Structure formats: C-alpha cells, structure tokens
C-alpha cells in the first residue's frame, strides 16, 4: 500500500467526502464525534499512518472520543506515528500549558504509545536545527498522511501567523498579540512571544487535511476564511488549495 492511500489508491477519507468540502454540524459535540470518526477511519485504513495533531480546546473532545473508540473497538495503534503541529518556545515541556503536555495527557498516555510514536518539538532546544530535525523525522516516515488542524482566532494555522508574507517550511514564529493571550498560556507565568511550527508547505503536503472550526471569538476569522479567498492575512485560507481538504464547522 502506498503512503497515505487505501487499497486501490483511494483517499483515506474517501468514504466521508461529501460533494462539498465544507460540512456544517449542529454543535461542538457533533463536530467532535464526526472528527473522531474521520481519524479512526484513517487509522483503520492505514495502521502505520503518520498523523499531525493540533492542540488546545478545539480538538480536545475529538481526541477524547477517538481514544474511547480505539479502546472500545480494540484498534491496534502500535504502528502509528503522531506529530506535534507546534509548540511554545522558551517553556519547559513539562509545564501544564505546553502542547507537549496536552498530547501526553490526551493522546500518548491514554493510548499507551511508545516514546518513538510521537515526533515532537523540544521547547528547551529551539533553534533552526530543531526545525531540521523534526522535518527530517517526518520525511523518514514518508510524510504526513493526515493533518488535524483548528482555526485560530486571528486565522492562524498552527503558529503560522498572519502577515505580509508566510514561511513555507518549519520555522520559529513571532506570535501575534492575540496568540500571546491563548488560553493554554494562562498558566505560563511569563510572556511567551515565540513559537515553533510546521510551515504551510508541510501542512499542504499532507495527503489529507481536516480543519475543525469551532469556539468563541472566531466569527471574524471564520467569515474571512469562508470567502475562500487565499490571503496571507488568513493563513488558514491556504487550505483551499488542498485537494483532499475537509472542514467541519460549527457556527
């Protein structure tokens, strides 16, 4: 079986693809339930899939449902590789607000994953070499099969922040003022002004992309995203260029 494909070369999520890319759901619970089914379908279709995961409130219930289904249905996860989409810079990885702690608590530990099943940025060692290390690890695995994302309040994707230009590759980013007020950073005890993130090229190279749009304070970013006009002012708008892109939206 080729990377990122089911038997016969079909999309891993083909059975879920509607005529349109956009799927509106009634509430956060329904969105999370459907997203977990997508994830489970990918895992069943390709047991050694490489799946990039966003963190935070948006995908939290999705991951809870996914873990629940995996245990209930006794799905083998021993060959999976998960990739951390981004991380705050200059915070110890063990702090409560880090993306590392989030994934450890909601994916790695509940599923009993081995250490080598998570490709992760090390926030204590952030430099361009760290970008290269993570990029190379993903490449050795054959690239991303699925990237699970959330829409930021300012339209960011991962920590690819709005601006006059965007960096395609994995990079260290200067955080937008709104991102610096992120819920996850409320326990940091210090200002956090930088992040490290996979770039838009890394995301768009994934075989499948699943975007979750839900949460308070995102109406403006959602409205601008839904125009389907690609702009560096809304990094998430670049997902409209992807051929296997599904957006679940609860507005």
UniProtKB/Swiss-Prot annotation:
GO terms for cellular component: cytoplasm; cytosol. Keywords: Hydrolase. One of its GO terms (molecular function) is identical protein binding. Disruption phenotype: Deletion of the gene does not affect growth on N-acetyl-D-galactosamine, D-galactosamine or N-acetyl-D-glucosamine. Gene3D superfamilies: 3.40.50.1360. The keyword Hydrolase applies. Its EC number is 3.5.99.-. It comes from the Bacteria. PROSITE patterns: GLC_GALNAC_ISOMERASE. One of its GO terms (biological process) is N-acetylneuraminate catabolic process. The keyword Chaperone does not apply. The active site is at residues 86, 154, 156, 161. CDD domains: GlcN6P_deaminase. PANTHER family: GLUCOSAMINE-6-PHOSPHATE ISOMERASE. Belongs to the glucosamine/galactosamine-6-phosphate isomerase family. This is Putative deaminase AgaI.
């Amino acid at each position: 079986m080729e990377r990122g494909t089911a038997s016969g070369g079909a999309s891993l999520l083909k059975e879920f693809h509607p005529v349109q890319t956009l799927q509106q759901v009634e509430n956060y619970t329904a969105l999370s339930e459907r997203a977990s089914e997508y994830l489970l379908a990918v895992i069943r279709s390709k047991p050694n899939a490489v799946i990039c995961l966003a963190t935070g409130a948006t995908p939290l219930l999705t991951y809870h449902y996914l873990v629940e289904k995996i245990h209930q249905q006794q799905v083998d996860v021993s060959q999976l590789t998960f990739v951390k989409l981004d991380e705050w810079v200059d915070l110890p990885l063990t702090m409560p607000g880090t993306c590392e702690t989030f994934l450890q608590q909601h994916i790695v530990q509940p599923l009993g994953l081995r250490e080598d099943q998570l490709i992760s940025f090390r926030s204590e060692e952030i430099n361009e070499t760290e970008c290269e290390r993570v990029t190379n690890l993903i490449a050795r695995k054959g690239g991303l099969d699925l990237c699970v994302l959330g829409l930021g309040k300012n339209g960011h994707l991962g920590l690819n922040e709005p601006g006059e230009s965007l960096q395609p590759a994995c990079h260290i980013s200067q955080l937008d003022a709104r991102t610096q007020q992120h819920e996850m950073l409320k326990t940091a005890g210090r200002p956090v002004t930088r992040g490290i993130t996979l770039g838009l090229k890394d995301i768009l190279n994934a075989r499948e992309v699943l975007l979750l749009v839900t949460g308070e304070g995102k109406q403006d970013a959602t409205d601008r995203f839904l125009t389907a006009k690609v702009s560096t002012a809304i990094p998430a708008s670049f997902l409209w260029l992807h051929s296997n892109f599904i957006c679940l939206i609860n507005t």
